[in-house]
């Protein structure tokens, strides 16, 4: 573990500031008054499917053929960690989604989803361990998921309560999306050891939400809401707010409930409608949330990579995160876009997918593109604000005290959200007040987030 801690410390010193060398600009485009510069971080990749910004301030990447690598965001150097021998690539199938354990220094686990052959084509969730610059010690947490060469879903997200969400596609078996006993066409929720959480919507069932066709984007925003992007069939692609036990309508409903048959089904089954759609479909893939001052025009927005659409879509959100504004489309000169992540410095990294058999690749493909405001200079006020809010004691049992860095100039609201993003308590600092004591009476033991304008902190209630 000493090696891993040293690696992360060294990366922290390099990864969040200026890039070691400025790559040539490939193009620029405006976002409001900001000029966003596009450059190539690294080239010659083979279908980068997932990009994850790690706690070591490196980009962790899967490529569909089975390789997992770390990418230096300063130099673009790609360091392979493992090539999984049992990955079975076929059409859209292969090595797909990945997520890192949030406590990576003490739990150096990497979770991946991929297709494999075992008396048929299947999908599985595997945990790997990072040690001495390599990945190994695979543990299958969930296997035997029916699959075909398309519609595997496969995005992963770890929630603050340390449960894992995993999207699955319908594997071209349309009725499976409404069948709660099938793992297909769902967003599954598991513990990090692969067991089923006791508080899942249906006891003993991994299904968290259902009625999905092929969700391939998944992100939790700072508002606590979970968003997923989903491939439609022909009419509409979607962005949905994911809620426990919710039905998203497939295969009867595609996109909005705006046809007669859809409306009847939606009413009878309390179907959740998307907050944003593309019509016609654009092949929406990776999804991330952006709220950094480096590009002010993108703050509080979802950014979605599209394959058939060959563009990046900005989806602005309202303050509550429940309503989406009109989409803005950029980055239209680089072909199919699949993977996306954001660094703490406000740079956006986008992976192209032009070697996936559905495009004519250029000499540089596939590549990771960097989108950045090169004129942005971080200051103390634009750095992460999470450290400005203090909580004690933590863990807490009966009460918790909140301390602001300075007295509130106006009344300031405090929100406590549970691990699923639900608001469970609200309080308020009065103008001139800097310290506030909150009763935790009635809140169950677990992990919560405390949010104010001064930042967000994690709270453990015992």
Positions of predicted regions on the chain:
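Short coil/turn segments at the loop-to-beta-strand junctions that recur within blades
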Residues: 45-48, 85-89, 144-149, 203-204, ...
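C-terminal outer-membrane/trafficking sorting elements
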Residues: 382-392, 396-462
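Acidic, Gly/Ser/Thr-rich repeat motifs that build Ca2+-stabilized beta-propeller blades
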Residues: 21-174, 225-232, 280-319, 347-357, ...
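Surface-exposed loop/edge segments in extracytoplasmic proteins
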Residues: 77-80, 324, 422-427
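Beta-propeller domain segments
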Residues: 23-28, 93-95, 103-105, 171-327, ...
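Bacterial Sec-dependent N-terminal signal peptides
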Residues: 1-22
């Amino acid at each position: 573990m000493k090696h891993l801690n040293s690696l992360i410390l060294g990366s922290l010193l390099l990864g969040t500031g200026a890039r070691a060398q400025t790559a040539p600009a490939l193009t620029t485009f405006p976002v409001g008054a900001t000029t966003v510069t596009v450059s190539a971080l690294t080239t010659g990749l083979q279908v980068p499917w997932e990009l994850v910004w790690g706690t070591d301030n490196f980009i962790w990447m899967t490529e569909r053929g089975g390789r997992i690598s770390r990418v230096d965001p300063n130099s673009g150097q790609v360091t392979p960690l493992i090539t999984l021998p049992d990955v079975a690539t076929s059409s859209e199938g292969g090595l797909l989604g990945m997520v890192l354990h949030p406590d990576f220094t003490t739990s150096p686990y990497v979770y991946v989803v991929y297709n494999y052959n075992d008396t048929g084509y299947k999908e599985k969730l595997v945990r790997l361990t990072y040690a001495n610059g390599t990945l190994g010690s695979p543990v299958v947490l969930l296997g035997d998921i029916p699959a075909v060469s398309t519609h595997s879903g496969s995005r992963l997200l770890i929630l603050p309560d340390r449960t894992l969400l995993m999207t699955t596609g319908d594997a071209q078996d349309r009725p499976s999306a409404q069948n709660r006993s099938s793992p297909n066409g769902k967003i599954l929720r598991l513990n990090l050891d692969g067991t089923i959480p006791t508080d899942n919507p249906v006891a003993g069932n991994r299904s968290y939400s259902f009625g999905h066709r092929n969700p391939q984007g998944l992100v939790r925003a700072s508002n606590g809401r979970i968003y997923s992007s989903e491939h439609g069939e022909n009419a509409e692609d979607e962005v949905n707010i994911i809620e426990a036990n919710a039905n998203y309508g497939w295969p009867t409903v595609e996109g909005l409930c705006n046809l007669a048959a859809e409306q009847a089904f939606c009413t009878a089954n309390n179907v959740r409608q998307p907050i944003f759609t593309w019509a016609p479909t654009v092949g929406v893939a990776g999804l991330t949330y952006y709220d950094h001052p480096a590009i002010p025009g993108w703050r509080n927005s979802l950014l979605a990579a599209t394959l058939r659409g060959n563009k990046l879509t900005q989806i602005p959100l309202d303050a509550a995160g429940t309503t989406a504004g009109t989409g803005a489309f950029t980055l239209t000169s680089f072909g199919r876009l699949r993977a996306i992540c954001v660094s703490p410095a406000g740079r956006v990294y986008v992976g192209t997918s032009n070697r996936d058999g559905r495009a004519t690749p250029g000499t540089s493909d596939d590549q990771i593109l960097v989108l950045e405001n090169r004129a942005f200079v971080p200051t103390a006020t634009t750095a992460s604000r999470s450290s400005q809010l203090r909580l004690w004691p933590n863990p807490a049992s009966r009460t918790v005290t909140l301390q602001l860095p300075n007295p509130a100039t106006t009344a300031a609201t405090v929100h406590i959200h549970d691990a699923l993003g639900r608001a469970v308590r609200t309080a308020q600092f009065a103008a001139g007040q800097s310290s506030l004591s909150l009763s935790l009476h009635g809140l169950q033991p677990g992990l919560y987030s405390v949010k104010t304008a001064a930042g967000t902190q994690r709270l453990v209630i015992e």
